[in-house]
Amino acid sequence: MKFAKKLTATIAVCASVTFAGAGVSSAKVFHGHWIGGRIEEAYHRLGGWKTFGDATTDERVAKNNGRFQVFAKDASIYWHAGVDNGIAHQVGGRIRNKWGDLGWEGAALGYPITDELKTPDGKGRFNHFQGGSIYWSPETDAHQVWGGIRDKWAQQGWETGELGYPTTDELLTPEKTGRYNHFQGGSIYWSQAGGVHSISGPIRDFWGSQGWERSSLKFPTSEKYAAGGGIKQDFQGGSIQYFEPTGKALE
């Protein structure tokens, strides 16, 4: 019995072995679980035990021959040889929860290609993934944005632009002919016929009051632009113009 206790304590502190995971040849045991290779590199690069706490699993197989490991402080590290030059990345908290809801690395977002990072405005956090991004802020929680909608949002300054943070995931429109994300300061809509366009302010309010894309206006086909002393935006079925002095948007 004394020998067994002594052996367990020795293993729990540190050991090195031949290891076939995450592109490495050696690994160590930290508090009872093996951590090795690129996952171990990320573990130490991002602060080690102070950031992650104890490993709660050994390294496990992920989709498409990747690897991952789960840690006590609500975080995981994921690795794939073909992603970001084989660098392992951390994903945690509400962002990890959202990623999990959407199907983890086996779904459209794929593997993380960044660690969780602070947003330039200092108010939120994000991870970029192979297929898109997840952004979190205290006011909006975590939401996914990808594809043409993400590209448009990026063109307009990400979360530092007029639109702010996403307040929904990308969703299918009710009639299933388009996609959209709502943001703190507006929306971005995509349709095959109209392309991808942002819409905000009084023009968005008026469009919404008419029934959104289900109205006779249908989907936006342009960004807003100056015209006739006001601000105008074109749609499949017409235009909406907003005049600052009156504060009214007219079709």
Question: Which sequence ranges carry the predicted segments?
Answer:
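Secretory targeting and sorting signals
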Residues: 1-27
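Extended, compositionally biased repeat/scaffold regions that form elongated interaction surfaces
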Residues: 23-251
